[in-house]
Amino acid sequence: LLLVFVLAARGAAASAADAVPELLKQVHWGETLQSLLQQFDGAATQLPRSLDFGDSYADVVLHGETIGGAPVVTFFQMDKRTRGLKRIQLERPRRGVNPPALRAISAALQADYGRPDKICLTPVSPIGGYQAAAQEVWVRGTDAISAIYRDTTLQAFEGCLFGVASGYCGLTGQLLVRIDRIGRFGITTRVGEC
């Protein structure tokens, strides 16, 4: 199902003022928290408590950005060791993860960066929380842009105490774009690696 949406997104139009190319012009890898807060002067919010992303943390978010007209929340992920900007993650709020948003975001990224260098698909399985996933990867210069689409299938309701009527008891859909430097965690130096 995700493959159909990814392939269908190729023909849609996108806005030229999308967040990804603009952010890449505005920020610098290794930049400090204070520098980000100054640069976005009031548009960025410092969180009362940091969000942990494993190898990084985010205590600054930027609201009001869009990709292909779809609103996203921007997380500036800071390196735990150096405390400098390590990665940028733009995430669609969970309640807004749907096929039109997926198509709009994919089309906008393809309008800005061309065809992905690689597309990876992850099939539904119990070990993956019954989530199907698709990932598009673009490598441009020293930057890697990765769009990740995850969706939960009906099998995810297996094991719920009261079945489907009890609502979600596991993972829900997720739609995010990660911007990273080549060679950093999760991104290899080989072009198009998922």
Predicted regions and their residues:
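Mid-chain, structured segments of secreted extracytoplasmic proteins
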Residues: 58-103
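Generic secondary-structure boundary/loop-capping signal
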Residues: 4, 21-24, 82
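Short amphipathic alpha-helical patches
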Residues: 7, 59-64, 132-133
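Bacterial N-terminal signal peptides
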Residues: 1-10
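Non-cytosolic coordination micro-motifs
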Residues: 15-55, 89-194
